Amino acid sequence: ILSALPGKASTVSAEIPYQTFRDFAENKGVFTPGVTGIEIKDNNGNAVGTLDVPMIDFSSVSRRGSLTLLSQGYGVSAKHGGLGDVNNASFGYDKNNYTVVKNNKHSGLDFSLHRFSKLITEAAPADINISGQLSDSSQYTAFYRAGAGTQYIKERSGKQTHIPGTFLTGGTVGTPWYSGNNLISSSPGDTYNKSQGPLASYGQMGDSGSPLFAYDSLSEKWSLAGVTLHNNGVNGQKKQLVVIT
């Protein structure tokens, strides 16, 4: 059973430049939306993996990482920890701020839908047209996330080092499994397991509401799979998300 610790930011590999995870979440450098075959290199410049699917456009993710744009006027997040009562959110490289005029909190699930005072034009809304089972690795061939807050880098020994500052970072997540009640779980805290991809990213305390995106190899599109709810501790491996449909 996962503990009720809200996720915040992420734990990532200490063997890959930290800037790589920041560039990934902000679509900077080689991480241009639509580009395929992006080679990931470690601190010594050695190739450690390749991102084979078209790079996602993360512009739908708010600068704080806890809200994702679903249309030009609405965004989705978790409900707990005050996320169901947000007043504003910012998007884009210019960090333009938008006022939330209505918060709609789901009565039974831990997620919330927010309406903005005006249309947001500098960000591309996420798709939520999920078909089939997210656990079907033949259809959903990649999972990416982004979030912001307290950061850690993790060595193979398990030692974690805190990185000061607040940054939007992102990375890869292994194929999730269903855990009941519209929930899915994954194990991106198993940082050096190849099943988590070359840029494994594990949400930490405060990252609640941050998105998980799934790449559908049949439709060749990225969709919002769910938003982060909890993890099983700073040194844990698993996290839990609510599926957005």
Language-model segments: what does each one mean?
Residues 30, 78, 84-87, 123, ...:
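Short, solvent-exposed loop/turn elements at domain surfaces
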Residues 1-3:
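Sec-dependent N-terminal signal peptides
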Residues 5-47, 57, 63-82, 167-197, ...:
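C-terminal subregion of chymotrypsin/trypsin-like serine protease catalytic domains
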Residues 59-61, 101-102, 112-116:
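Cell wall/extracellular polymer interaction/catalysis modules
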Residues 59-65, 92-96, 126-129:
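Short strand-coil-strand connectors
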Residues 83-96, 139-148, 214:
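Short conserved beta-strand and strand-loop elements enriched in small hydrophobics
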Residues 71-72, 76-109:
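Catalytic-histidine neighborhood of serine endopeptidases
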Residues 108-206, 228-233:
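Chymotrypsin/trypsin-fold serine protease catalytic domain
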